[in-house]
Amino acid sequence: YKYPNVLYTVKVSGAEMKAYMEWAAACWNQWKEGDVSISFNPQKPGYLHDHFIGLNYEVNLSKPAGERIENVTFQGKPLTDDMTLTLCVNDYRYTGLKNEGIISGEKEWESSASVRDMLVAYLAEHDPLEPAVDHNWKITGVDLQKDNPDRATLIELVNTGRLESPYSQSLNLDTYSEVLGMVDNVKVSDLDKTGTAASFVGADGAPYFRMRDLAYTFNGSKNQFNVSWADGKVAITTSTAYDGELFPLP
């Protein structure tokens, strides 16, 4: 933590608190039907992505920025606009919120130690560190279709490095065929060698190999060839005809 920030406290109304929460929730993009993941607004870098302790709340990503914060409670009661809360933030965030007109109060307290020094002291006292999750907030309004086999295929391609999942835009099942077309052809190997670069394991755990990658390997060749799978590798041998069994029709 390289910045010399200190902590401030400031009184805010419930309305100001919810405005601050909406400001932070704008870090996400609005979820669209068919999105396989959530994505992030590139105009709102990660250091603006604040979370809030002491409140329970939901972030509905099916709604546009500014309308996402729902069901906010404080100490078990709904947070109303006229409630008064004590907010603790660092001096950088306080100044930004004031400049944007999100909060209006003046600081009431300032820490004598920097955030950096407080972190060092806390970590020294809690070694090993055992972080706990508050479970005080959740994302709603999304259906990631986790049981959809097409989604499983896209996730597998991302996890194996075959397909990029942009930070600022989710892959979407409505453009599934187009997304698959983004996966580059891979030349598996030279002839008479083996390779795994173009293979992947599908959602059912079985190995798969793309026919178009095999075609790319043999582009321009008139040789006979044999293809086999052994020890997690596709073996491609030329000058011998295919000696495997015919695949059954679906």
Model-predicted segments: where are they?
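Primary recognition of N-terminal secretory signal peptides and signal-anchoring hydrophobic helices
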Residues: 177-250
